[in-house]
Amino acid sequence: AAAAAGKSLDEVADIAQYTADNMATLAVAMRGATHPVTGAVLGELPDDEMEIGMGQHGEEGGGRCKIKTADETADIMVDALVKDLELQRGERVLLLINGSGATTLMEQLLVYRRCVKHLADLGIEVAANYVGELLTTQEQAGFQMSMVRMNDQLLEYWNAPCNTAYFKK
């Protein structure tokens, strides 16, 4: 959007760097992915456990724990991202919930609903959002949560029309 608005390459690079510096992501998995060719399970998890911080392809992450409710999981992840970004009351974020592949849109929306409430309780506004699947892993149950600290310029670019092969708004 910045390039389409006529920004120079240096300006676009600065905006991209600001975004990268003000973004954090955390994933949770309730079931590991499967290899699309061999069917081998990548990152096997017991049925009663989940892993917060698991990588996109089953890499071990921040630790395993007993399965928690969607609200409990959302709260843990929001708190971790808010801390990582050092977000303060009055700030705005872009909140993205990306389904891992075997997580339904309804489940993703339940997590999103709780995130919005928890962030509001912390005095942080969800100024923009995306809930759905952008990057998936075959048969992995879980999701990634990303937050980006928003300023007026980023919000303007996020809200600009977009029409690519995969992402449209």
Model-derived features: where do they sit?
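Mixed-charge interfacial surface used for oligomerization/domain docking
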Residues: K7-L109
